[in-house]
């Protein structure tokens, strides 16, 4: 029985030795270096020594870090413990689940109270700045955009005073250590500075500055021997990273709580972070509400000159782009106008070319046909003279008279074409030979001349024309135009043709309506253009010649699609002659 007890004690002793060996090691404590590396090591080295003594076999080292170095060290795991203010503890805890072991209660280093944190807004006593609103337009220095005592608390105080830190005054961040910011204020590099509470008094005790040269803005009453512009919060929290075992964390916590009375630092239970977190939310720096734009904003504040240069360059490029686009738009409109004018000139040249070709063709036809027509008339008239001398009732006399009349009509047609060509070439219109023409007789004559009853027996003519209605025109001009339009309608398949003529306020109007189905709108716009036709056997000259002849008679002609009286689709041709179109009496009238 005694042997078994001895063996059990030996096993427990071995386990204890193994556990102690497992706990033994070297541990790094990352500490926020508010006043630089040398000052931080000197101030906190007694803590590392006390922990090493309280925990045999464990060695603790001090590692001074600024805000950004602290974040990087936690992310990379190069430190196992951290000592920092509650605000940074909240920030770090969002990236790694830290365990808050203790909060600092008091120190025995002979300096001003160092277990609280706040901000004091300092300015030189001889600067003339006595209120927060005197900072408008001035340069205010701070340690870092994320520094709790070195910026955020002062930022909140100035905002509560009605100032807009980013707009009402310029911010300049100097980084750690905070001593440099006080020196810059002393040398007038900045007009005010946001520094941690008690920094001024500690530097004064060390003989680095004279605190009487400075005053505090937004000063608040406090039982501490330090100036402050903000409420005070618990400072310096001791936390362990997740990599630290629970056993070691417990041993360190006991060592902190059970420090000897002569120790430099005395710790207690962790203080609440609720007030700190509420303030971080007020200044929009809480990790649970941070947004990318806040980081961008902080970066922009720290790089104002570079950002200003980039913005200026961007504005110059934008103005240059706008100017170039205005020039392009202006040149584009000018090119469009020039293009329209060019197309108009091209159409005018094309029309002139077509008219020139048409004029040459007309002149050629008139020249070539005039002599045969004259010979036909001479032969017909000679035959008439001989036959009348032999027999007044000879049966060939009516036929010869028709030959003579039709030859004369052909000659008149050629003469009208030659007059039109002469007008197109700029010669004046000769109206002495014009005469009053009965419109109803001209329609009947054309109908008989075209032999419509024999050639197109399915076409029915409907006329509403007064027998007394006359128009003063060159000989056979109206018949030429009517013949072309009537023939076009019949060849297009019309079964009914309506012709209405009436006197209007300023002339004579003749309207011809068919039911041949109408004309395509695209072709309708080019109906009077020479050489435009919808029939394979057509030359595209009929309507073009009609338009020129009507204009030669000082009138106008138009064409459009319109439903016929029988309900079928069709085309309407309207011819209008003015009263002043030229007769020697200067009038187209219904009486002739």
Curated annotation (Swiss-Prot):
It comes from the Bacteria. It holds the Pfam family HATPase_c. GO terms for cellular component: plasma membrane. Residues 364-581 form the Histidine kinase domain. The keyword ATP-binding applies. Autophosphorylated. It is found in: Cell inner membrane. One of its GO terms (molecular function) is phosphorelay sensor kinase activity. It is an enzyme of class 2 (transferase). This is Tetrathionate sensor histidine kinase TtrS.
């Amino acid at each position: 029985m005694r042997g078994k007890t001895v063996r059990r004690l030996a096993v427990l002793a071995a386990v204890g030795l193994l556990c102690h060996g497992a706990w033994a090691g070297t541990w790094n404590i990352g500490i926020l270096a508010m006043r630089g590396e040398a000052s931080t090591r000197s101030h906190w080295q007694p803590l590392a020594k006390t922990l090493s003594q309280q925990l045999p076999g464990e060695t603790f080292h001090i590692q001074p870090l600024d805000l950004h170095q602290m974040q990087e060290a936690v992310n990379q795991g190069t430190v196992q413990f951290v000592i920092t203010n509650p605000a940074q503890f909240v920030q770090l805890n969002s990236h790694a689940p830290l365990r808050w072991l203790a909060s600092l209660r008091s120190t025995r280093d002979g300096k001003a109270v160092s277990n609280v944190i706040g901000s004091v807004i300092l300015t030189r006593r001889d600067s003339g700045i006595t209120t927060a609103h005197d900072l408008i337009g001035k340069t205010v220095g701070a340690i870092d955009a994320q520094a709790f005592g070195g910026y955020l608390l002062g930022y909140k105080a100035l905002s509560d005073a009605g100032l807009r830190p980013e707009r009402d005054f310029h911010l300049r961040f100097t980084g750690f250590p905070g001593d440099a910011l006080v020196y810059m204020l002393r040398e007038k590099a900045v007009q005010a500075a946001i520094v941690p509470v008690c920094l001024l008094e500690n530097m004064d005790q060390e003989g680095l500055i004279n605190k009487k040269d400075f005053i505090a803005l937004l000063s608040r009453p406090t039982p501490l021997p330090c100036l402050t512009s903000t409420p005070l919060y618990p400072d310096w929290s001791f936390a362990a990273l997740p990599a630290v075992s629970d056993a070691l964390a417990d041993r360190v916590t006991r060592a902190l709580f059970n420090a000897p009375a002569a120790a430099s630092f005395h710790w207690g239970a962790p203080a609440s972070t609720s007030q700190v977190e509420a303030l971080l939310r007020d200044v929009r720096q809480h990790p649970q509400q941070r947004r990318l734009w806040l980081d961008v904003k902080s970066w922009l504040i720290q790089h104002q000159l570079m950002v200003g240069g980039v913005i200026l360059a961007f504005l110059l490029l934008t103005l240059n782009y706008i100017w170039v686009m205005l020039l392009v738009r202006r040149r584009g409109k000018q090119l469009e106008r020039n293009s329209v004018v060019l197309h108009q000139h091209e159409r005018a040249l094309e029309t002139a070319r077509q008219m020139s070709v048409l004029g040459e063709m007309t002149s050629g036809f008139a020249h070539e046909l005039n002599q045969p027509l004259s010979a036909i008339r001479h032969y017909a008239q000679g035959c008439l003279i001989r036959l009348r001398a032999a027999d007044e009732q000879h049966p060939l006399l009516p036929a010869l008279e028709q030959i003579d009349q039709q030859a004369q009509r052909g000659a008149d047609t050629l003469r009208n074409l030659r007059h039109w060509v002469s007008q197109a070439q700029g010669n004046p219109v000769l109206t002495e030979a014009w005469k009053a023409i009965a419109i109803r007789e001209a329609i009947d004559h054309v109908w008989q001349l075209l032999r419509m009853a024999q050639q197109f027996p399915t076409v029915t003519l409907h006329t509403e024309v007064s027998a007394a209605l006359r128009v003063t025109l060159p000989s056979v001009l109206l018949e030429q135009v009517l013949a072309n339009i009537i023939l076009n309608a019949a060849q297009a398949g019309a079964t009914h043709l309506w012709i209405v003529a009436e006197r209007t306020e300023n002339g004579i109007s003749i309207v011809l309506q068919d039911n041949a189905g109408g004309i395509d709108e695209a072709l309708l716009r080019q109906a009077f253009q020479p050489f435009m036709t919808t029939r394979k056997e057509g030359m595209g000259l009929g309507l073009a010649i009609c338009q020129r002849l009507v204009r030669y008679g000082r009138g106008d002609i138009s064409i459009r699609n319109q439903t016929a009286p029988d309900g079928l689709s069709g085309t309407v041709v309207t011819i209008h002659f003015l009263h002043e179109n030229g007769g020697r009496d200067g009038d187209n009238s219904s009486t002739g």
